[in-house]
């Protein structure tokens, strides 16, 4: 009986961890909604509307910007919470300019307890809505994002550099997902770069994280470390 209780406790803890670990911040653009499209922002396992269970801690901290080639400086956007049946909840913002553009979002979750360890969680998400190599070069880097993934294309070849405060991050795992079930994980080299060949045309997502072994206090809560997680989405290959 004791063994069974212990096992259930372990499973319960693992399940709690899996819920927290499996949620990430995502930006997607609905091109057909509004004059210039609408950015939908989700905090879910994947880039789609879910129950929005973990949205509440973000209510005072979420910030989203748009950058265009014509206006490269980030312009802050107003966000509106949306709900749909059954039990769908997300955040959206109408976009004031057409592509080429980058929609960049940063949200601070706060302190989350993993087992006995309190971790301060930061989330970053971007959608690069570009068609050409030149536009990608202009919009690829989001300077306001502490953790960023910067793509560089050459035909069907793609390099992605992971940056922390503008500096390359070696040995960082980058999770890549794409059309027709494409799924592969890469590790950055000493220059913070991963390289891949684009197979099927379509929308790709990239995800990485960075850990700071730094203790501190957020509000009234103490934490032992800081975790930053970033996602990037874009359609590949570029047409020009």
State what each model feature region is.
Residues 1-5:
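Positively charged n-region of N-terminal signal peptides that target proteins for export
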Residues 6-16:
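Bacterial N-terminal signal peptides
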Residues 21-240:
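N-terminal soluble domains immediately following signal/targeting peptides that reside
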């Amino acid at each position: 009986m004791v063994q069974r209780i212990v096992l259930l406790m372990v499973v319960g803890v693992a399940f709690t961890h899996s819920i927290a670990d499996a949620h990430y911040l995502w930006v997607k653009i609905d091109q057909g909604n509004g004059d210039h499209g609408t950015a939908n922002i989700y905090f879910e396992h994947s880039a789609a509307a879910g129950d929005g269970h973990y949205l509440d801690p973000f209510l005072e901290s979420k910030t989203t910007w748009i950058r265009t080639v014509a206006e490269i400086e980030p312009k802050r956007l107003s966000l509106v919470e949306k709900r749909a049946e059954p039990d769908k909840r997300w955040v959206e913002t109408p976009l004031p300019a057409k592509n080429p553009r980058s929609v960049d979002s940063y949200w601070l979750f706060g302190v989350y307890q993993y087992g006995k360890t309190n971790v301060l969680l930061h989330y970053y998400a971007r959608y690069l809505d570009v068609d050409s190599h030149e536009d990608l070069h202009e919009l690829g880097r989001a300077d306001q994002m502490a953790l960023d993934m910067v793509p560089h294309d050459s035909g069907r070849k793609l390099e992605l550099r992971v940056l922390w405060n503008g500096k390359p991050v070696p040995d960082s795992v980058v999770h890549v997902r794409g059309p027709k079930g494409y799924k592969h994980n890469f590790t950055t080299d000493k220059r913070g770069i991963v390289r891949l060949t684009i197979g099927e045309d379509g929308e790709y997502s990239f995800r990485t994280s960075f850990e700071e072994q730094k203790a501190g206090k957020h509000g009234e809560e103490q934490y032992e470390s800081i975790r930053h997680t970033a996602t990037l989405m874009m359609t590949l290959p570029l047409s020009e």
